[in-house]
Every structure is written in structure tokens, then in C-alpha cells.
């Protein structure tokens, strides 16, 4: 897709860790395990005056708090942003509210596998050391096979060597596109990992006996979908 690009040493999360550090160094506060559930507007409905935040406590219970604000910058999905606006003072037209409510998102699951090796390698060239053939050169591989659910493979070693503690091992991510609440989303971690490993083995990319560790992550609303009410 592209020949060269910049990438954080410890992955994209490092970017936001740096942003968070700078915000806190400047006196800002970051609320973890919290989400905005309501926007309170001024009487004329032209600005946001405060937000209602729901925070999760250590005992698992939730508490709400109203926080005044001078500026409000949103990274919420549009669907949730419009739904959170105080309906009593809302100036959001009904057709806009209906469009926002009908927006569709694709959810995402990634299964990480730590491997002793991949079965696929770079093409051998005369005089090339075996160690140089251990990994394919790609950062990601898009999967075209119609008989598997897998959408894309990431090889984290090739993103940054600092993402893998042991450079002799291979750390890959298997990416699946799904919908929150569907059968694939509702699999247990163990079921999902077994499913992903079986698919990759069926493609000849790995042997399941080479799996050293595994992890599954769910990501809600990873991608906006350009259909349903989006066209309106």
C-alpha cells in the first residue's frame, strides 16, 4: 500500500500515552473508566454548558457526575453524540436525529498469537542466512480466501522490533470484522482463539503446535459503515 511511513516505537498506543502525559503535565485531568452519557445545553441550545459523566468504581458500581465545561470536543460516535444531547433543550432536527440513530458501525476483534515461527517465509535467495527468512516482509496481509472469516493478518515484528520481547519469536494479530452481539462476538476468549488458530492453520500459515500464547481483544464501533441512513 505504501513504501515507507512513520510508526511509534512501541505501537500507536504510545502516541496517546504521550498526549495523556502532556495533558497531565499541563494540569489537565483524565478520567479513566468513564464515559459521557448526556450533554446539557444552554437555554438557547447553542452551546454545551456541562456534561454528565458515568464512572465505574473499583467495586464495579457506577456513579454519575455533572461537570461544567468551557469547551467541548467530542470523539464520540455520531450516533451516541446526538443521542446524548439533552432532549428538553435540543435544537437537533428530528430528521437529523433519525439519521444519527440509523447509522451503522462495524465492530472488530483481533486475536493475537505469539508463535515460535510462521510456516510462510520470504523467498530464499542464494547466500541468504536462514535467520533472514524467518519472517515475511509484510506488515499486514489481506486475506482473500472465501472459506475463512479472517480479514487481515498483522505481523507486529515488522511494525517495530520493540513490540516483541524475543526477536526470535513471531507476534501476529488476526483481524475479524463482525457486529457486537453476533455469534462470533459472543464467543469466549478460548473459543475465539481456537477458531482463529484453526483458520490460520488451514491456510498453511502456522502450525497450532507453534502457538506459545494468545490474547483476544474486542473493539466496538471500529469502522463507520457507509450505508443505511448514511446516504441521507
Model regions and ranges:
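Proline-rich low-complexity regions
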Residues: 8, 210-211, 222-225
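A short coil-to-beta-strand element that immediately follows conserved catalytic motifs
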Residues: 31, 108, 206-218
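FAD-binding beta-loop-beta segment adjacent to the flavin cofactor pocket
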Residues: 160-167, 219-232
Amino acid at each position: 500500500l505504501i513504501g515507507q511511513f512513520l510508526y511509534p516505537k512501541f505501537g500507536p498506543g504510545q502516541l496517546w500515552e504521550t498526549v495523556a502525559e502532556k495533558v497531565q503535565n499541563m494540569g489537565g485531568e483524565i478520567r479513566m473508566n468513564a464515559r459521557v452519557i448526556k450533554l446539557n445545553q444552554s437555554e438557547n441550545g447553542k452551546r454545551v454548558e456541562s456534561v454528565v459523566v458515568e464512572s465505574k468504581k473499583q467495586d464495579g458500581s457506577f456513579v454519575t457526575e455533572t461537570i461544567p465545561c468551557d469547551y467541548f470536543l467530542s470523539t464520540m460516535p455520531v450516533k451516541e453524540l446526538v443521542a446524548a444531547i439533552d432532549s428538553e433543550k435540543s435544537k437537533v432536527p428530528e430528521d437529523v436525529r433519525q439519521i444519527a440513530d440509523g447509522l451503522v458501525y462495524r465492530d472488530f476483534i483481533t486475536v493475537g498469537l505469539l508463535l515460535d515461527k510462521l510456516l510462510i517465509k520470504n523467498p530464499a535467495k542464494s547466500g541468504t542466512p536462514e535467520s533472514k527468512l524467518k519472517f515475511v516482509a509484510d506488515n499486514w496481509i489481506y486475506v482473500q480466501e472465501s472459506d475463512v472469516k479472517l480479514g487481515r493478518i498483522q505481523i507486529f515484528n515488522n511494525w517495530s522490533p520493540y513490540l516483541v520481547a524475543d526477536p526470535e519469536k513471531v507476534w501476529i494479530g488476526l483481524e475479524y470484522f463482525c457486529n457486537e452481539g453476533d455469534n462470533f462476538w459472543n464467543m469466549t476468549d478460548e473459543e475465539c482463539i481456537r477458531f482463529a488458530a484453526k483458520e490460520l492453520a488451514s491456510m498453511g500459515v502456522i502450525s497450532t503446535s507453534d502457538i506459545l500464547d494468545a490474547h483476544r481483544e474486542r473493539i466496538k464501533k471500529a469502522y463507520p459503515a457507509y450505508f443505511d441512513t448514511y446516504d441521507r
